[in-house]
Amino acid sequence: MTKKKTEKEKGINNGYITQVIGPVIDAVFSSGILPKIYNALEVQSKEGPIICEVQQLLGDNRVRAIAMSATDGLQRGVTVIDTQAPIAVPVGKATLGRIFNVLGQPVDNLSDSVGEDTLPIHRSAPAFTDLETKPAIFETGIKVVDLLAPYRRGGKIGLFGGAGVGKTVLIMELINNIAKAHGGVSVFGGVGERTREGNDLYMEMKESGVINETNLLESKVALVYGQMNEPPGARMRVGLTALTMAEYFRDINKQDVLLFIDNIFRFVQAGSEVSALLGRMPSAVGYQPTLGTEMGALQERITSTTQGSITSIQAVYVPADDLTDPAPATTFAHLDATTVLSRGLAAKGIYPAVDPLDSTSTMLQPLIVGDEHYKTAQLVKETLQRYKELQDIIAILGIDELSEEDRLVVDRARKIERFLSQPFFVAEVFTGSPGKYVDLENTIKGFNMILGGELDDLPEQAFYLVGDINEAISKAKTFKN
């Protein structure tokens, strides 16, 4: 008994492995000093230490843990050390411009120094008394988003779009704009996506200046990756690692933070794998019975407090395009807005290719955004919807067969469609056009002028890839000359 106490005082609590099934490890510890749920266990292997997280206490002094890296080469009898704390990751300014894994270890072949500050990845959501309850618009400077599907400060946005329609460029522009307009930073969590995509994103961020190679502390983003080739434990926890880094910027640095999760479906998928490995009975469509709890634990920590905010943009993969699948259906319950990217618009060369009719937001209410913004947004949608209805007639009979009123609608809709495009700062290197940040007031003013018929005599090309309406008017003059 005395020996146990001494070991506990020294902080030593060793056990040994009794079973290894893939990424799941069972270990036996001395009676009375079992590791707590979510404690990190360290197992020595030939490849270096393997960190596991305690998930279940099985009785008979046995615990079941899930490994955060490959368990190749482990065998029964190997010593397991209880670290007596959950996984903790580095936080603060030193994380900017760096790439981390789920354990907060740098994986970008730069220096291992990432500052002294660390926080555990398992934390409580902010207390209700600390929350900012008044809904506020989070201005992005992107016309189509701010007008038709505005983001809530501290809200959660679902980003839907296939390959090659501009998700990455939109994400990088948002990272750039929050840094310039809000003095905020971003954290990108790559959850269970392709390693190639993670590498491409990193290279593009360096190219566009979002990551400053010469002075990393001037970078605007920290990257956390747990890619497809990682064990399910890492993919399930990497979202929490990214969120913990974001929480520090919000709570300690009192900044506005953008948290990107790509892809939230992979978080659910990893949880499903872990659940099966832990022997839980599957629920609907084979998902884990704890799906709602796991999703809630992550999403409830993403919020606005009186100190700062975390606004989260989550890429959502919809399996087999089935919106009733439990994974996307559970995600939708937490979202404040959806941004849908359209392949049709991308094919027309209209970037950002945000679908103005499919994208939605709970913020688009007169009481929140004001009457003028609401009416303008509704009129823009009505005009575009009418144009969509007329497209079949135009394709068969031609535009000349339309009534004068409908021709005017088509003319204005085409101008609106082009005016919804915008040159991005991060795309300057590809397009040669300088990026534009358009504030909400100028966005509303521009669309009101088009809808009111003040610009009916201007050519539609003048509205393509411009910032505010004054730029479109100036561009039209160059055509006339």
Curated annotation (Swiss-Prot):
It is found in: Plastid, Chloroplast thylakoid membrane. GO terms for cellular component: chloroplast thylakoid membrane; mitochondrion; proton-transporting ATP synthase complex. It comes from the Eukaryota. InterPro entries: AAA+_ATPase, ATP-synt_VA_C, ATP_synth_F1_bsu, ATPase_a/bsu_AS, ATPase_alpha/beta_chains, ATPase_F1/V1/A1_a/bsu_N, ATPase_F1/V1/A1_a/bsu_N_sf, ATPase_F1/V1/A1_a/bsu_nucl-bd. It is a peripheral membrane protein. GO terms for molecular function: ATP binding; ATP hydrolysis activity; proton-transporting ATP synthase activity, rotational mechanism. Keywords: ATP synthesis, ATP-binding, CF(1), Chloroplast, Hydrogen ion transport, Ion transport, Membrane, Nucleotide-binding, Plastid, Thylakoid, Translocase, Transport. It is an enzyme of class 7 (translocase). One of its GO terms (biological process) is proton motive force-driven mitochondrial ATP synthesis. Produces ATP from ADP in the presence of a proton gradient across the membrane. The catalytic sites are hosted primarily by the beta subunits. This is ATP synthase subunit beta, chloroplastic. It comes from Pylaiella littoralis (Seaweed). The gene is atpB.
